[in-house]
Design a protein with these regions (language model features):
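N-terminal auxiliary segments of SAM/dcSAM-dependent transferases
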Residues: 2-14, 25-91
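Conserved class I S-adenosyl-L-methionine
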Residues: 220-252
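Class I SAM-dependent methyltransferase SAM/SAH-binding core
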Residues: 134-137, 141-188
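A short glycine-rich, Lys/Arg-flanked "PGG" loop and its adjoining helix->strand segment in the class I
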Residues: 208-222
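Short alpha-helix
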Residues: 244-258, 285-296
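A short acidic, Gly/Pro-enriched loop at the edge of an enzyme's catalytic core
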Residues: 187-198
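Class I SAM-dependent methyltransferase Rossmann-like catalytic core
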Residues: 90-116
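Conserved Class I S-adenosyl-L-methionine
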Residues: 45-46, 265-325
Length: 325
């Protein structure tokens, strides 16, 4: 299938200037009834729960509000701020990392992965015929992969969870049927039990217990991880983090007791990258937190104008185990 592009709108001057500011917060105010806004939240709100008290949420003006009047603003960029204050995570992607990732993905270098993920999703036969269905993307980043999955599931809606407000600005616009909310995926998710038909996890932390809780009994978990061969030609020169050789074993341990593996598809193909592509690749990942941007650019430039590398991924499907007892 044709790969859906990530949201292509660039940050405004104001967004760049205020990249570190988190939009929205939880607060108490009198309840007001307002019609639900157009967009995905009218469909998604049934799945979401108040992160303060666990009660249901409803759309109220430009916010989500529970019966106890805990209120969560829908930022002007379209995402909902469920994390606030000290609960925000320190390792969320920066504005610069998000811009680099967007540029790299829009160049099409991971299009084979995006297409394979969409085909795998379509082959699952979920949701049941006649049902709209819900896809939860845990650690969604810019929503690039969620958009592809939603294209493969006409009528389904998607919820992108991520800790980075900069990424969420993109995720909220990645697809007309996608909503986005700020959240730390290591914490219990602010969604009800069994609400998801598919849980998507692409290059993101894995919370096996929460994946199982929010996934319906006939649902599926899709996990994408890099293999040890991924970008092997660039790791030393750019200072990229090595892929743990025991990553597959650790993945199985993380999901053990919650999921049974169904199948894994290996996807490997050559990459031809420009110096700008290599710079974006280095700047969009964890290395950007440890190496100065100028040094990353110098390392990328030293590799030459055209660079050959290997893209190598595992796409795994898991099914939820029945409850114990």
């Amino acid at each position: 299938m044709t790969e859906p592009s990530a949201a292509r709108d660039a940050y405004t001057h104001e967004e760049r200037a205020q990249a570190g500011r988190a939009d929205g917060h939880a607060h108490d105010q009198p309840a007001r009834r307002e019609p639900a806004p157009r967009g995905p939240w009218g469909a998604l709100v049934e799945a979401v729960r108040c992160p303060v008290c666990g009660d249901s949420l409803a759309v109220a003006e430009r916010s989500l509000r529970c019966p106890n009047r805990h209120t969560f603003d829908i930022a002007r960029q379209g995402y909902v701020s469920l994390l606030s204050g000290a609960k925000r995570t320190a390792n969320a992607d920066s504005a610069a990392m998000v811009l680099a990732r967007t540029a790299f993905l829009e160049a099409g270098h991971y299009a084979p992965l995006t297409g394979a993920l969409a085909r795998t999703t379509a082959a699952l036969g979920l949701p049941a015929e006649g049902a709209g269905g819900t896809v939860l993307d845990a650690g969604a980043g810019t929503g690039h992969y969620l958009a592809a999955v939603l294209e493969a599931l006409p009528g389904a809606v998607g919820l992108a969870l991520d800790a980075s407000p900069h990424a969420l600005r993109r995720a909220a616009r990645a697809h007309p049927r996608a909503g986005a909310a700020s959240w730390d995926v290591w914490r219990p998710f602010p969604v009800r039990d069994g609400c998801a038909d598919i849980v998507l996890n692409v290059f993101a932390p894995r919370n096996g217990a929460e994946f199982r809780r929010v996934l319906g009994p006939r649902g599926a978990l899709l996990v994408v991880t890099p293999t040890g061969r991924h970008l092997r030609e660039l790791r030393g020169a750019l200072g990229l983090l090595e892929v743990d050789p025991d990553k597959a074993e650790r993945l199985e341990r993380t999901l053990s007791g919650h999921f049974a593996p169904e199948r894994t598809e290996d996807l490997e193909y050559p990459l031809e990258l420009s110096a700008a592509d290599v710079a974006n690749l280095a700047a969009m990942g964890p290395a950007a937190r440890h190496v100065e941007p100028e040094e990353l650019r110098e390392r990328a430039a030293a590799l030459g104008e055209r660079v050959q590398a290997t893209a190598s991924f595992g796409i795994s499907v898991y099914r939820p185990l029945p409850p114990a007892g």
